[in-house]
């Protein structure tokens, strides 16, 4: 059974998609961007904001980023990856010592002039 997940703690989607979908023990989170004034915010702030929003979505299903098994990062400038990695590592270490599998891809542009977008897949034993 497919179940839509939505929390008011995380920004609502900017298009026709769900914040996340749960199928049995897996939760598939849509790509998250920082929905602030992305032109004037740095990559560190955007990454922190996205990870917090992802965590809010997971908390609504009694999980946290420690349940994430895979992330995909879309970034507009791979030169920013060192900064992203620093924020990402510090955030995950608050919840787990095991980092999820990950892919990272440079893209030419993201919605709302975001510098980064992250999607995730989480797993929870029931």
Swiss-Prot record:
InterPro entries assigned: RidA (IPR006056), RidA_CS (IPR019897), RutC-like_sf (IPR035959), YjgF/YER057c/UK114 (IPR006175)
Entry's Gene Ontology cellular component terms: cytosol
GO molecular function: deaminase activity
Gene3D superfamilies the record matches: RutC-like
Cysteine disulfide partners in this protein: none
Cited Pfam families: Ribonuc_L-PSP
Coiled-coil stretches: none
Family statement: Belongs to the RutC family.
Protein name, UniProt field: RutC family protein bbp_334
């Amino acid at each position: 059974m497919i179940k839509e997940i939505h929390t008011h703690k995380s920004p609502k989607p900017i298009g026709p998609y769900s914040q996340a979908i749960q199928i049995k023990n897996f939760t598939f989170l849509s790509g998250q961007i920082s929905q602030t004034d992305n032109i004037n915010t740095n990559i560190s702030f955007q990454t922190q904001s996205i990870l917090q929003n992802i965590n809010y979505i997971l908390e609504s299903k009694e999980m946290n980023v420690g349940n994430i098994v895979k992330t995909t990062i879309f970034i507009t400038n791979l030169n920013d990856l060192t900064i992203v990695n620093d924020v990402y590592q510090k955030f995950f270490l608050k919840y787990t010592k095991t980092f999820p599998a990950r892919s990272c891809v440079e893209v030419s542009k993201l919605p709302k002039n975001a510098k980064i977008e992250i999607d995730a897949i989480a797993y929870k034993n029931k």
